[in-house]
Regions:
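Residues within helix-turn-helix
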Residues: 47-48, 59, 66, 86
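Short alpha-helical elements of helix-turn-helix
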Residues: 2-6, 26-37, 122
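N-terminal leader segment of winged-helix/HTH proteins
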Residues: 1-26, 71
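Charged, amphipathic alpha-helical coiled-coil/dimerization segments
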Residues: 16, 66-129
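Short capping segments at the starts of secondary-structure elements
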Residues: 42-46
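Short, locally clustered residues in the helix-turn-helix/winged-helix DNA-binding domain
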Residues: 37-41, 129
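Residues within the alpha-helical elements of helix-turn-helix
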Residues: 38, 53, 71
Length: 140
């Protein structure tokens, strides 16, 4: 396997495990925090809008939303203008998770980039952004 792909694959697996452990401390599973983050930014979005924002399928969002609704973190409400649509809204418990989850994510980022200089960190973010743009373009 090419050097970059191998290193990226191993790093991604480790990062995913660390991120999963961080959100599990708050009763969430990896992915649920991403859905909640979309709603923290703009509450009342449709599953399709959330799917586009986090680059997953609408059925995947629906499944995550069901688990979050069952946990009391969000609720489904019909769209007031289109009866075919459902919108997802945070409950007070869902809103209350924003600060601790964002703090966990920031602490994780700080921990894993602690050995990088500011210049190295900026370069890494710039390089990863360029790679992401190529992949998004290729998959479009």
């Amino acid at each position: 396997m090419p050097e970059f792909l191998e290193l990226h694959s191993k790093t991604s697996k480790l990062l995913r495990a660390a991120a999963d452990a961080a959100v599990q401390r708050h009763g969430l599973r990896l992915g649920q925090d991403h859905l909640l983050a979309v709603l923290w930014a703009e509450d009342g979005r449709t599953p399709g809008e959330i799917a586009a924002a986090v680059n997953v399928t609408t059925p995947a969002v629906t499944k995550l939303a069901t688990r979050l609704a069952d946990s009391g973190l969000l609720e489904r409400r019909p769209d007031p203008h289109d009866n075919r649509l459902v919108r997802l809204w945070l409950t007070p418990a869902g809103r209350a998770l924003q600060e601790p989850i964002e703090a966990e994510r920031q602490a994780l980022e700080d921990r894993i980039t602690a050995t990088l200089t500011q210049a190295e960190r900026a370069h890494l973010i710039k390089a990863l952004t360029k790679i992401q743009q190529v992949l998004v373009s290729d998959l479009a």
